[in-house]
Every structure is written in structure tokens, then in C-alpha cells.
Curated annotation (Swiss-Prot):
A divalent metal cation binds at D241, H243, H275. GO terms for molecular function: 2-C-methyl-D-erythritol 2,4-cyclodiphosphate synthase activity; 2-C-methyl-D-erythritol 4-phosphate cytidylyltransferase activity; metal ion binding. It catalyses: 2-C-methyl-D-erythritol 4-phosphate + CTP + H(+) = 4-CDP-2-C-methyl-D-erythritol + diphosphate; 4-CDP-2-C-methyl-D-erythritol 2-phosphate = 2-C-methyl-D-erythritol 2,4-cyclic diphosphate + CMP. This is Bifunctional enzyme IspD/IspF.
Amino acid sequence: MTISQRTAAILVAAGRGLRAGTGGPKQYRAIGGRTVIHRALAAFSEHPDVAVVQPVVNPDDIDVFNAAVSGLRHEVPAHGGATRQASVLAGLEALVPHRPDIVLIHDAARPFVTSAVISRAIQAAGKTGAAIPVVPVTDTIKEVTASGDIIATPERAKLRIAQTPQTFKFEVILEAHRRAARDGLTEFTDDAAIAEWAGLTVATFEGDVANMKLTTPEDFVREEARLAAQLGDIRTGTGYDVHAFGEGDHVWLCGLRVPHSKGFLAHSDGDVGLHALVDAILGALADGDIGSHFPPSDMKWKGASSDQFLKYAIERVTARGGRVANLEVTMICERPKIGPLRDQMRARIAEISGVDISRIAVKATTSERLGFTGREEGIAATASATIRLPWSA
């Protein structure tokens, strides 16, 4: 049996994250252009040696969870409990039908876990049966009284900071959690503590200082700055598209169905705004153009909605570890009038792309009655896209 056939992971994501400030549960907040939970879940769902990924979420968050992790491999979420410990037990019980040998238990609030740490976790569990990732303590630690007076200075060389994923033989940690629940012990703060209480020896392995837990607003600010510093390859691409009018009673523009006296002559839905944006993004990536990715000769794209083209282009950026810094599109036409629809178009582009609306501009102009747009024979659009990539991409 291969490692990938017997290893499961639990992603604990049922907390409310109140200390992280406003904006909802911290696991659904964006950092570096992706939600925290998407980053954490992707690390496990994309790891070749993890066969089953079991999320545990608050039942009130099912819809937002599904939207945040769309496209990633995972099981149907288990419903979390009142404490982290209860949520982990729910995840373990959900894994029983899968009969894994090893389980990795990870906090969704640690979105920067690497494939290397996950691999070390799997190897450690196979050797010892129970192990956790740790990093050295670099500050001097003081033990204090309730009033704040120092009573001891622990020897720093013996101290370690515990991280996740904490990894165990599945049946062993399942039984330990069940025993703790039966005994009414509900306040363990991590799974290693439960294993210790159950009499298990818990080993350690090398963690990663970047695998930090996001807890406070300051954590988000610091990590946003760190991620931005890594994306030093700043690129800008441009795009252009045009479609002639034909029979019809509406046109698609920037993802909106706009009533009009004519329709577009086009292979897909003819959305010139989104097509220009897609070309701009692909140009910034030096990754061809919309025609090379979605050839008009392919009947698969006949009448296709252009929102899928924009999502695809954004995914190409994300796949290279990048993020979109700005999207701008200018519509060139006499009619329909773009001004009244500008904010709706920005909102729709934001919805499709996942880019914050503050980074999206929609503009409009005419050709002063000159040329085919002036004669109202069609609509043109120009676009630009600025993206940030790591230099290695």
C-alpha cells in the first residue's frame, strides 16, 4: 500500500477568529490575493501523498467555504463543535469510513504550510506514531505570577514552539480523542497534549518559521507585506477586442447582459470587455492570447459565456504564484451607454475574477462618430492588466 493510499489530513476551520479583527472568520479572509483557507487546503489537496482531505467547518459557513475552496479536492465538510478539540474529533469520526493509517491534523489559520513540512509529517508518523513540527524559541521566556512578577526563566534550549500539521497513527489518536471526550476533558489546546495525556510519546520534527498561525490584525498586515515583497516581478499586458453587431436584443459587456437593439456576431457570447481583459492578462504572463487558448475553430466554445475565460486567465496567474494588481477596461461605442452600468460592471468583474473591486476600473469613450464604432456597427474594447509574480515564475 502506498503512502498516498493510507494518509489522510484534517483541516480544522470551524473557529470564528475574533482576535483577527473585523471581516468575518479569519480563515475566509484574503491574504496575498487568496483566502486563508484556500491556501491551507490547497497545500494538502495538491500533495501527492495525501489521499483524503477532510475539512471541518462551522455549519453556518458551508456556503462561504464552498466558494472559498472551489476547485480543490476535499471530502464533504464535517461540522465543527464548540471547541477545537470537538472539531478535531468530528473530523476523525468522518474519516473512519476511509480507514487511513496516518492522519495529519492542521489548523486552517496556518496558510503557509509547505509541501516539505507535510512530507516530513508523513514520514515522522510512519516512524514514531505521533509527532509534531516545531521551531526553536529565539526569545528568552519568562514564567510569571498572576500579578506579572517573574518567578522563573526556563532554559531556552529545551523549549520549542509547536506547529501543525500534528501527525499520528489514526486509530491511536482517534481512541485518545474519544477517551478524552468520554472523560469530559474538553480544553486541550492541541492534539499532542491529548496524546501526551493518553500516555503516548510524541516526537518532534523540523517545522518552518513561515508556517505561522494568523491570529491578530497585525499578523495579516505583516504577512501581506511579506508576500508582496516576494512578488517583485511586476508585469503589464494589454488587450483589444472588437465585435460587429448582428441580429439580437442584447449584448454581453463585462459580464453583464445589457439590453440593446442589436446583438453580437461572435463565436462565444462576444463579450468584448472580458475578452480584452483576458488578452491583457495572458499578455502579462507572456502566455499567448485568447485565441490560442480558446480557438474559434473549436465548437466547444460556441456560445460560451466569457466569464469562464476570465476565470481561466486568473487561474493561470495564481498557478504561477502570482496575483493581479490592477484590471482596467475601456469600452469604445456610441451605444449602449456604459456610464450608468460602470459600477455594476466593476462588481461583476470582481465577482468573476476574485480581484478586489478597488483594483478594477471600467471606462468608456466614443470615437466621435468616426469609424465602425461611430457608425454603430459594433463595439471595441481595450484593456490593461498589471500582475505581480515571483521572480522564479
